[in-house]
Amino acid sequence: MLEQLMEALRCLPGVGPKSAQRMAFHLLQRDRKGGLQLADALSQAMTEIGHCTECRTFTEEEVCHICTNPKRQENGQICVVESPADIAAVEATGQYSGRYFVLMGHLSPLDGIGPSDIGLDVLDYRLRRGDISEVILATNPTVEGEATAHYIAELCKEHQVEASRIAHGVPVGGELELVDGTTLSHSLLGRHKI
């Protein structure tokens, strides 16, 4: 049973055999009550949390609180992100007040992940509905993220919906000599007048 617990803990990202062993021993030696609370919370979350039918983020309702907020629908914007964690990051800026669409990943043909695997058929349907005026592409600046953004931009073009890409560049407080060449290239190409 101990081996089963350690193996189950290894499903978490970044948890290898040693970390799983430490966690299991900690719960059994020092925090059995916490372990039971963790098991209950995990069981409840796995049962009751699903995906929003509009944006695909995690929610306990059929439609999440962002998608049901009428103020979020006024500007006709949706921000396409790869994961629910990306929504939290964008929301933390306080600079965006539209709706979202969560891909739950990115296109990766080598891994067998195609458009329907990341919900692009659902996004296509939403674009056809006609209530979206702009799609803000906020996928990660990786090869897969860029390919996904390009695919979605083409989808937007088919539906005559404006598509924009979030800016990439030198981080605030960063030093140019430490920035990689690709990031610096994006910064130079995406410069704007002040």
From Swiss-Prot:
For this UniProt record, the keywords arranged alphabetically read as follows:
DNA damage, DNA recombination, DNA repair, Metal-binding, Zinc, Zinc-finger
Q: Which GO MF terms are attached to this record?
A: DNA binding; zinc ion binding
Zinc-finger (C4-type) residue ranges come to 52-67
Coiled-coil boundaries: none
Q: Which Gene3D superfamilies match?
A: 3.40.1360.10, 6.10.250.240, RecR Domain 1
Q: Name one GO biological process term.
A: DNA repair
InterPro entries for this protein: DNA_Rcmb_RecR, Rcmb_RecR, Rcmb_RecR_Znf, TOPRIM_dom, TOPRIM_RecR
The family assignment reads: Belongs to the RecR family.
Q: What is this protein called?
A: Recombination protein RecR
Which organism is this entry from?
Vibrio campbellii (strain ATCC BAA-1116)
